[in-house]
Every structure is written in C-alpha cells, then in structure tokens.
C-alpha cells in the first residue's frame, strides 16, 4: 500500500476538525444547541479518523526527520513539543466535555469547554503548520 498521501489526508482531517469546532462554537454563541451538537460530534468523528490514520501512517512509515536548520528548526521543535503535549491533553478533555453535554450537565460542560475549545483549535492549527513545515518546506 502507498502511504505517501496519508500526511496530506491527515492535515486535511486536522484542518476540518478545527473548522468544525469553530462552526460549533459559532452556533452555540447563537444559541443553536442542536447544530452546535452536530458540529462538535462531527469534529470528534473527524478527529478519531485522523488519529487512526495518523497511527497507521507512523506505524508503517515510522518517523519523518525535519530537514530545516537554524532558527526554523528551533521554531519547529518548540511548536512540535507544545502541539504534542496539548494533543495528548486534549483527548480526555474533549471526551469529558462531550460526556458532560450528553448527560445534560451544561454548567460543568461550559466550564470545561472554556479550556477545551482553545486547546483544540491550537492543536488543529499547529498540526497543519507542522505538516506544512515537515512535508512542504
């Protein structure tokens, strides 16, 4: 199997997840709870597909070495470290935030979502930036 297209596919999934989260946020700000729920559950589904595809790619291909040097290399690894830590952190946060909403505990849902939302957006954006730096520079 040719795995060469998976990094681009993963970046598209990552960007799509971030866009869905932003659309979900916009709809909850407009008090459109049912549309918010659909966007957020869609974002979770896209993120799950991303994660499976990401694992398959790295299982089959291994790690890819960043080719840049100097300040761009420092920037890349700083971004990668923050992205990786927050990507691991966001998974239980998203699951907890969704669980609270699905159980109807909206006070706690809103409280944790204030942290979950910006981290999820950061991870989506930095994931795409890392892809561009690693595969397109």
PLM feature spans:
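Alpha-helical membrane insertion/targeting regions
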Residues: 1-137
């Amino acid at each position: 199997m040719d795995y060469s297209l998976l990094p681009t596919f993963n970046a598209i999934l990552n960007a799509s997840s971030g866009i869905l989260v932003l659309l979900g946020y916009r709809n909850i700000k407009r008090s459109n709870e049912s549309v918010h729920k659909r966007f957020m559950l869609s974002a979770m589904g896209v993120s799950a597909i991303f994660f499976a595809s990401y694992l398959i790619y790295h299982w089959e291909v291994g790690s890819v070495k960043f080719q840049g040097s100097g300040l761009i290399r420092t920037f890349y690894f700083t971004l990668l470290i923050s992205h990786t830590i927050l990507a691991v952190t966001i998974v239980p946060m998203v699951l907890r935030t969704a669980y609270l909403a699905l159980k109807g505990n909206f006070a706690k849902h809103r409280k944790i979502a204030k942290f979950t939302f910006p981290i999820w957006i950061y991870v989506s954006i930095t994931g795409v930036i890392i892809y561009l730096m690693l595969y397109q520079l």
